[in-house]
Amino acid sequence: LTFGNERSVTLAAGEEKVSDAVTYRLRPQQRLAITVNYGERTPDEASCHRGARTTSYIISGESVPEADFSKGEEAVHWYNIASIEVEGRDQTAIAVLGNSITDGRGSTTDAQDRWTDFFAEGLSKDPATSHIGVLNLGIGGNCVLRGGLSEPGVVRFDRDILGQSGLSAIIIFEGTNDIGSFGENDPTVGDRLIAAYQEFIRKGHERGLKVYGATI
């Protein structure tokens, strides 16, 4: 991968970069590995997906295509890579806003058996829906309104959901943590969740997207 035709890139804290496009044919549900080589200094704290349920392998020194990762340190997180954007002919996608239920809580490490994985597999097997992909934007411990882990849904919706390319629909499957964390002491949580959902729906419809809600 290159960034502006350069084989290396420097990121400031909180900064995002998009690589140059690369020609690489992918199949639906194909697993993909990305190797990140750090320069002279490894970051003290690397941004990561805490609940990836997928193993990363860490070795010292610069990796090469023949690098042996079998003796590397294992970590069940993804590091640094926020997303992969894939171009396809007549392809669309459904983005899912969710918490740990969507992120993969209870699924099997390295098996890719979250509910969104089964959903994507089912869509790909039906000729009528095989052109539709599924984008899992679930974050364990996430809330819609406030608190929880990472930015709440009302903050990250525009970036994480509407910022995706090629969308045709959105599924909103979040709110459990708001009710469980604040509902007992805050009787307004229900009404404020409804207001947040209505705002998500409005924004989605403005983009011409279908918006589906999941029961919580």
Placement of each model-derived feature along the sequence:
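N-terminal secretory targeting modules
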Residues: 1-97, 107-109, 128
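Catalytic nucleophile-elbow at a beta strand-turn-alpha helix junction centered on a G-D-S/GDSL motif
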Residues: 91-117, 140-143
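Structural recognition of the beta-strand scaffold that forms the well-ordered cores
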Residues: 93-98, 102, 132-138, 168-173, ...
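Alpha-helical cap/lid subdomain in secreted, periplasmic
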Residues: 110, 117, 121, 125-127, ...
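Mobile, glycine- and charge-enriched loop segments
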Residues: 126-144
